[in-house]
């Protein structure tokens, strides 16, 4: 599988894990639901923006969309950290997602740097 397709699959799997995490949050806790919806929105946007990047009409648009991916991934990490720190879910559920998020940020950062260097 090529790297582009692999990252498409990886970001989609990440989004699916975020969806399952949201579904596991307590339904009767308003704070958990607010934080969860924010994580859901940001976490599912990473893959959507990555797909948009590969439909970009220019190198500048590609770089911009990869930047959007990075922003959403960083925001996702923020919401996951709050969910962990407020004990809405156990660390063993959140830490693997946070690790995957960190890895996605690293890959996307590399893509962004290479694209800018080749611009």
Residue ranges and their predicted role:
Residues 1-119:
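Amphipathic alpha-helical assembly/interaction segments
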């Amino acid at each position: 599988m090529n790297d582009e397709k692999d990252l498409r699959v990886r970001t989609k799997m990440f989004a699916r894990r975020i969806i399952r995490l949201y579904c596991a949050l307590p339904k009767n806790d308003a704070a958990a639901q607010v934080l969860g919806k924010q994580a859901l929105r940001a976490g599912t946007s990473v893959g959507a923006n990555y797909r948009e990047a590969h439909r970009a009409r220019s190198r500048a648009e590609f770089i911009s969309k990869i930047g959007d991916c990075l922003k959403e991934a960083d925001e996702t990490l923020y919401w996951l950290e709050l969910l962990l720190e407020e004990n809405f879910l156990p660390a063993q559920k959140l830490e693997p997602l946070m690790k995957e998020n960190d890895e996605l940020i690293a890959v996307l950062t590399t893509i962004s740097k290479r694209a800018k260097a080749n611009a």
